[in-house]
């Protein structure tokens, strides 16, 4: 009886020999996913005006979730660099890619929003009408709440005010609200702290932090970096 029980146990054991490898039947391991391209990839980029160098050569990258500061005196090329990356000017040498596409291409423009000295607001339209116009032209970030964004930038109660009646700082806040509503992953901001008080500077920093936390990125120029917070990933210092 004892030998019978041992035999029964042996029959239940799996049969292994030297020619069997459990890994042989496992599915092949897939290659790791290709990382997405950086939001900005610049290599030896330079620009000159009338044969006089404006900036460069510059090389840098900006990844999702990063904020990069461009710092420099007036005339150092901060605005020119942003215009080159937006596809409004052609560089003299080097290369730049915006999410893997050429600056100014349809693919790049679809993923990019800019804010400069000219805010592009319609003075005869109300604050709310300006925001709705921006969303109609350029789309809207998923889940965006216009009233919540107005409150975030300190314009709660100003939705029905014509933009022409606002102060310079309130107009800047309106443009910031429009920016926050857009679906663009990359922000190019030229002097966003101009015409803002301490509270307005805090609004800019809060919007930048939220945008970076959501996987976006921003390239920000600032004269003297006034008010710029500590979340900056790196700083480009341009010399006049």
Predicted regions and their residues:
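Conserved ABC ATPase "signature" region
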Residues: 132, 143-158
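Q-loop/switch helix immediately C-terminal to the Walker
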Residues: 118, 123-139
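Hydrophobic anchor residue at the start of the ABC signature
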Residues: 176, 215
């Amino acid at each position: 009886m004892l030998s019978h029980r041992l035999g029964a146990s042996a029959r239940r054991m799996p049969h292994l020999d030297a020619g069997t490898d459990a890994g042989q039947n496992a599915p092949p391991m897939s290659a790791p996913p290709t990382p997405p391209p950086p939001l900005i990839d610049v290599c030896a980029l330079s620009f000159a005006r009338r044969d006089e160098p404006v900036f460069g050569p510059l090389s840098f990258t900006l990844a999702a979730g990063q904020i990069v500061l461009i710092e420099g005196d007036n005339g150092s090329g901060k605005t020119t660099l942003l215009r080159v990356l937006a596809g409004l000017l052609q560089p003299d040498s080097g290369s730049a890619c915006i999410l893997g596409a050429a600056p100014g291409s349809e693919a790049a423009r679809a993923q990019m929003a800019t804010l400069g000295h000219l805010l592009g607001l319609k003075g005869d339209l109300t604050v709310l009408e300006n925001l709705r116009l921006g969303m109609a032209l350029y789309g809207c970030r998923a889940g965006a709440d216009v009233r919540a964004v107005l409150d975030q930038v300190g314009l709660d109660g100003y939705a029905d005010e014509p933009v022409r009646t606002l102060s310079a700082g309130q107009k800047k806040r309106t443009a910031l609200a429009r920016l926050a509503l857009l679906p663009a992953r990359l922000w190019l901001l030229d002097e966003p702290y101009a015409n803002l008080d301490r509270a307005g500077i805090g609004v800019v920093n809060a919007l930048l932090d939220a945008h970076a936390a959501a996987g976006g990125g921003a390239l920000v120029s600032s004269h003297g970096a006034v008010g710029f917070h500590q979340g900056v990933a790196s700083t480009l210092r341009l010399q006049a």
